[in-house]
Amino acid sequence: MKVKSPLEVYNYLPRTNCGECGFDTCMSFAAHILDRSVTPLDCKPLVRDAEKDPKVKKKLEELLELTAPEIAEVVIGVGENAVKIGGEEVLHRHELTFFNPTGFFYDVWDTMDDKALEERCDRVVSYKKFYVGNFLTLDGFAVRCTSGDPKRYREVVKKVASYGKPLILVALDSECMKAALEEVADQRPLMYAATEGNWKEFLKLALEYKVPVTLRAKDLDLLKSMAVTFKQAGVKDIVLDPVTEPLGEGLKGTFERVIQLRRTAIAGQDKDVAYPIMITPIAAWLIEGDDVTKSYWEAVIASIFIVKYGDVMIFRSIDQHVVMPTITLRFNIYTDPRTPVQVEPGLRAINDPGPDDPVFITTNFALTYYTVESDLTSGGIKGWLLVLNTEGLGVEVSVAGGQFTASKVKELIEETKIEEKVNHRYLVIPGLAARLQGAIEDETGWKVLVGPMDSGRIKGWLEKNWPPKE
C-alpha cells in the first residue's frame, strides 16, 4: 500500500461525513482503509459519483491503486467458500500482519476409481478441527490430469466441483485444460500451470475463460518474463510457481527462490513479480522411501513455506500427522499480532452447575479460556467460570502487566451477579495468580482458594479441596 496516513486517503474521499459507510467521519473511514478492514469501494457516494463523472472515476481508480496491497490478491473459487491468496503488505509479520492464510488444496486424480474419489473428497470436505474458538478446515481440491484424456478429465472435474470447494486444475496439456474449463470456468478455478512449453495456449485459455493462472518456471528471469507477457496481454490474476524441490540442495534452492521473489516484490517494489506464490509440498512424494517418510517431508516443506511466503499449496497426504501440525501452524502465523485472540468476558455455566458448585476465574485469552473450559467440561466438573477481560493476555502476563487485578475481579463479580447464583463466597483463582489472593479477598470480601497451575489438574484438586473446610 503506497499511502501511509489517513490524511492521504481522506483527500480522495467526498469529505461529507455522510455515514453511509458505517463510520461517523470520512477520516475514520480513511483510517480503516489503511488497516484493510474496508476498501475505497465501500464508500458508496464515491462509487456512485464515479459512475457519472469521469473525473471522480479517475480519482477512484487512483485511490484503488494507491491502496492496493504490495502483493496482488487473487481469488480462487466463488461464493462463501472462495479462497483469497496473496494481498500481503510486509515481509515480516511483526511489521503489520499477514492477511490471507495459505490456501490448502488436496490432490485427486482422474485415474482414481469412483469410490476412492468419493471417499477422498468426503475426507477433505468433512475435515474440521476446533482450535481456540475456531473451526479449522481445508480449502479445496487440486484435480490432476493423469489420464491424458480430456473427456475423462472433464468428467472427474465436474464430479469434484459438485462438492462446492474451490478447484485447482492441474494439467499441462491445453486440450485437457480446455475441456475442464468448459465445465467449471464459472467457478473460477486456478489453472496450473503455464510453462515455457505451453504458455501460449494457456494464455489464450486464461483470456478466454477469465480465470486465474499459475506460471511455473525454476528460472526466475523466465518466470518474470512470462508474468510480464501475461500481464501485458490482459491477465490480472497470476500466481507464480518457482518449482518446489523436496530435499537437500533442491529444497535450499526452492527456499532461496521464494525469498528472492518476495523480497524483490516488496522491498524492491518490482510489480512484475508481485504475485502470490505457489508451493507444492506434494513434491515430497517424488523422493525415495515409504509413505510415512514422504508424508513427513511433505509436512516439513509445508511448514517452512507457511512461515515464508507460501500463499497456496498442493498436498497429497490427508493423514492427521500432516494436516494437524500444518493447519495449526497456519492459524498461528496468520493470527493478527496487533490483536490477541480473545473471547468475550463474562460468566459461563459449565455442565449445568448449581448454587453449591465452585466458582473459577480465568482470563479472556482464547487459548487459556478454551483450555480451562475444555478441561472442566471433559472432566465432568460442574462450576461457574468467570472470564476476566485482560485484553486477550494470559494469566501470568496479565498479572504482571496489571490487566488481572483485584479491582477488576470485583467489577466482574458485580457485573455478572454471580453472588445471586451461588450460596457460598469462595473463588478459585489460577495458580499463576496466587500473588493476588490477599488483594482479591480484601477487595471483594470473598474467600480465595489458589487452584493448580495447570487446569488439567483441577479435577484432582477439587477432590481434596472442595467443598472447602471452614
UniProtKB/Swiss-Prot annotation:
Gene3D superfamilies according to UniProt: 3.40.50.11600, Dihydropteroate synthase-like, Electron transport complex subunit B, putative Fe-S cluster
Leading EC class: transferase
Positions annotated to bind [4Fe-4S] cluster: 18, 21, 26, 43
GO-annotated biological processes: acetyl-CoA catabolic process; methylation
The 4Fe-4S domain, residue ranges: 1-62
Cofactor(s) this protein requires: corrinoid; [4Fe-4S] cluster
MF terms (GO), sorted A to Z: 4 iron, 4 sulfur cluster binding; iron ion binding; methyltransferase activity
Disulfide bonds: none
InterPro entries: 4Fe-4S_dom, Ac-CoA_synth_d_su_TIM-brl, ACDS_complex_subunit, AcylCoA_decarb/synth_gsu, AcylCoA_decarb/synth_gsu_arc, Dihydropteroate_synth-like_sf
Enzyme Commission number: 2.1.1.245
Keywords: 4Fe-4S, Cobalt, Iron, Iron-sulfur, Metal-binding, Methyltransferase, Transferase
Cofactor note: Binds 1 [4Fe-4S] cluster.
Swiss-Prot/TrEMBL catalytic activity: 5,6,7,8-tetrahydrosarcinapterin + methyl-Co(III)-[corrinoid Fe-S protein] = 5-methyltetrahydrosarcinapterin + Co(I)-[corrinoid Fe-S protein] + H(+)
HAMAP family: CdhE
General function of this protein: Part of a complex that catalyzes the reversible cleavage of acetyl-CoA, allowing autotrophic growth from CO(2).
PANTHER family, per database record: ACETYL-COA DECARBONYLASE_SYNTHASE COMPLEX SUBUNIT GAMMA (PTHR36214:SF3), PTHR36214
Complex formation: Heterodimer of delta and gamma chains. The ACDS complex is made up of alpha, epsilon, beta, gamma and delta chains with a probable stoichiometry of (alpha(2)epsilon(2))(4)-beta(8)-(gamma(1)delta(1))(8).
Protein name stated in the entry: Acetyl-CoA decarbonylase/synthase complex subunit gamma
The species this protein was found in: Archaeoglobus fulgidus (strain ATCC 49558 / DSM 4304 / JCM 9628 / NBRC 100126 / VC-16)
Phylogenetic placement of the source organism: Archaea, Methanobacteriati, Methanobacteriota, Archaeoglobi, Archaeoglobales
Name of the gene encoding the protein in the UniProt record: cdhE
